[in-house]
Design a protein with these regions (language model features):
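HhH-family (HhH-GPD) DNA N-glycosylase catalytic core used in base-excision repair
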Residues: 14-207
Length: 207
């Protein structure tokens, strides 16, 4: 085993030890939430395809649990061409019928139609700003907001930033982008660090 492998192993052991002593955020109590919490939630995303995926998944969650969406995530990727907006924007009636028959996703006609609409609006934003990343991150000044929450009841459902994001996305004809959904998107993509300060991931993502 070379030095890099030893280093990786030591880091993994230390991280596991920390998580055994310092509790995760309480919503991450079982899989698939645990892995998502430890590896993705709150990690800054600047890849446009990744941002589009979270935008669609957060909208799909409306009225459902995030656990439900995580369990369907791979099915969503397959059903929606790996979340490539340029392909989804060209979906027609045949694609909608195909998706409505797909038991691996949320078969809601409004949400499916919204995904197609959002793909078109997403491409328009890319054309205007160069990247969706540049547009979306402008709502937090281009860098993560480092919050210092101590308990889950301290975490808001929306903020002034998510309100502003929601208003502008709606103006650009995006669907399923209310302020609460926008704040969940901000949390997921690392625009805000909402891991509790008692969670080891908070410190890891604060740098």
């Amino acid at each position: 085993m070379d030095v890099r492998c030893w280093t990786f192993s030591i880091v993994a052991v230390v991280k596991a030890a920390l998580l055994s002593v310092m509790p995760r955020c309480s919503w991450a109590a079982s899989e698939p939430n645990v892995t998502y919490h430890d590896e993705e939630w709150g990690v800054p995303v600047h890849d446009d395809r990744g941002l589009f995926e979270f935008l669609i998944l957060e909208g799909a969650q409306a009225g459902l649990s995030w656990t439900t969406i995580l369990k369907k995530r791979e099915n969503y990727r397959k059903a929606f061409d790996e979340f490539r907006p340029e392909k989804i924007a060209r979906y027609g009636a045949r694609d909608v019928r195909r998706l409505l028959r797909n038991e691996g996703i949320v078969r809601n006609r409004l949400k499916i139609a919204a995904t197609i609409t959002n793909a078109k609006s997403f491409l328009a934003v890319q054309k205007e700003f160069g990247t969706f990343d540049a547009y979306l991150w402008s709502f937090v000044g281009g860098k993560p907001i480092q919050n210092q929450r101590r308990k889950m009841t301290d975490v808001p459902a929306r903020t002034t930033q998510s309100d502003a994001m929601s208003r502008d996305l709606l103006r650009r004809r995006f669907k399923f982008v209310g302020s609460t959904i926008c704040y969940a998107l901000m949390q997921a993509t690392g625009m805000v660090n909402d891991h509790l300060v008692t969670c080891p991931r908070h410190a890891e993502l604060a740098h």
